[in-house]
C-alpha cells in the first residue's frame, strides 16, 4: 500500500536535525548509488528534473519541475513528487511532496555543512532570499544550531519583513533589510537562497564567516560576485556538496575557479578535509542522494 503524504505530512516526517544526521550517515554508506540526474529544458525557461537514487533497502525518484517565471505570481517555482520504492518487493511505499522534500533537504545539507565547517556557528544568521528556501533555512538553523538572532534580506522589504515576522513567532530576534551586503558585516553565518538570476552578494565576508550558497545549480546561474568567490578560494576555504558541482556550480565557474579542486561535504564527513583558517564558502547544487536521505528518514 502506498502512503501519499501532502506537504504538511511530509514536513512532519523530516525534522531537520534527523535529516542532517542521516545525510552524514548516507555519505559513508557503500550501498548508495546515485545515477546522473536528467535535466530537460522546457518551453518558457523552465526545467524538468528526474533524479533517481537507491541503497540496499529503498529506491527513489524525484520528479519535479522548476519554473522560475512563477516567482511572484503565487504559483510555486518547484512542483512535483518523490516516489519511494521497496527494493526487495518493488512495491511503492511512499509518495512525498516534492517541494517540501527539496526545501527541507536543501536546508539540512546547509545545516550539516555549518555544523562541520562554520568557524562561528552561534550567529547571527543572514538569510538572503525570503521564499520557501529562506523559511526552511531559518527553521533548520534554529533547530540544528540553536540560532537565536537573524537578519532577512530581500529586494522586497515586504517579503523580508514577512519572513522576519515568521522568525519572531518562533521566538527568534529578527529584522528585515533590503541591503544584504551591509548586513553581512554583522553576521558570521549567511545563506543565499534566491532564484539566482543575478548577483545578490558582493561584500567580503568576516574572517569568521560561513556562507552557504544554494540558489544557483546550473553553470549560468549566479548569486555570488566572482570577486567574492575568489576571495574565499584565496584567503579561506571553498567546499561543495558533491563532486557534481564541477559542472553545475555557476557561482564558482563564472569566477574562473577550478571547482574539481574543492573538497566535498563527503570528504568532510569522512575526515579527509576540514575547514582550517579563514572564512568558509559552501556551494550546494543539489543531489538525488540528499533526497534519498530524506526518504530514509521518512520511511522510519
Where are these regions (language model features)?
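NAD(P)-binding Rossmann-fold cofactor-contacting core
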Residues: 144-170
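Glycine-rich Rossmann-fold phosphate-binding loop(s) that bind the pyrophosphate
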Residues: 130-131
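C-terminal helix-to-coil terminal segments
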Residues: 274-300
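N-terminal ligand-binding/catalytic initiation module
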Residues: 1-103, 111, 118-121, 288-292, ...
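Short, conserved loop/helix-junction motifs that constitute active-site signature segments
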Residues: 144-146, 203-208, 228-234
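Short helix-loop-beta connector
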Residues: 117-124, 146, 207
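Rossmann-fold NAD(P)-binding glycine/threonine-rich loop
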Residues: 214-271
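Rossmann-fold NAD(P) dinucleotide-binding segment
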Residues: 181-182, 186-189, 196-210, 223-226
Amino acid at each position: 500500500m502506498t502512503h501519499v503524504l501532502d506537504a504538511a505530512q511530509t514536513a512532519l516526517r523530516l525534522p531537520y536535525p534527523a535529516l542532517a544526521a542521516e545525510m552524514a550517515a548516507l555519505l559513508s554508506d557503500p550501498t548508495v548509488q546515485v545515477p546522473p540526474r536528467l535535466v530537460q529544458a522546457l518551453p518558457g525557461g523552465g526545467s524538468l528534473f528526474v533524479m533517481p537514487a537507491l541503497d540496499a533497502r529503498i529506491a527513489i525518484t524525484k520528479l519535479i519541475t522548476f519554473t522560475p517565471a512563477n516567482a511572484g505570481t503565487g504559483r510555486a517555482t518547484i512542483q512535483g513528487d518523490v516516489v519511494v520504492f521497496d527494493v526487495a518487493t518493488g512495491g511503492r511505499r511512499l509518495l512525498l511532496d516534492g517541494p517540501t522534500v527539496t526545501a527541507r533537504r536543501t536546508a539540512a545539507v546547509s545545516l550539516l555543512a555549518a555544523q562541520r565547517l562554520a568557524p562561528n556557528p552561534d550567529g547571527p544568521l543572514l538569510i538572503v532570499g525570503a521564499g520557501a528556501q529562506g523559511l526552511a533555512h531559518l527553521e533548520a538553523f534554529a533547530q540544528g544550531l540553536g540560532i537565536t538572532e537573524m537578519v532577512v534580506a530581500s529586494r522586497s522589504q515586504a517579503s523580508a519583513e514577512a519572513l522576519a515576522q515568521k522568525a519572531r513567532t518562533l521566538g527568534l530576534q529578527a529584522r528585515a533589510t533590503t541591503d544584504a551586503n551591509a548586513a553581512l558585516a554583522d553576521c558570521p553565518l549567511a545563506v543565499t537562497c534566491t532564484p539566482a538570476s543575478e548577483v545578490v552578494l558582493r561584500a567580503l565576508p568576516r574572517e569568521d564567516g560561513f556562507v552557504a550558497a544554494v540558489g544557483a545549480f546550473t553553470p549560468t546561474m549566479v548569486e555570488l560576485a566572482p570577486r567574492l568567490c575568489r576571495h574565499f578560494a584565496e584567503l579561506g576555504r571553498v567546499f561543495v556538496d558533491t563532486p557534481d558541482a564541477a559542472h553545475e556550480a555557476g557561482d564558482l565557474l563564472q569566477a574562473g575557479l577550478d571547482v574539481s579542486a574543492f573538497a566535498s561535504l563527503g570528504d568532510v564527513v569522512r575526515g579527509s578535509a576540514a575547514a582550517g583558517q579563514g572564512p568558509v564558502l559552501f556551494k550546494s547544487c543539489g543531489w538525488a542522494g540528499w533526497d534519498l536521505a530524506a526518504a530514509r528518514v521518512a520511511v522510519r
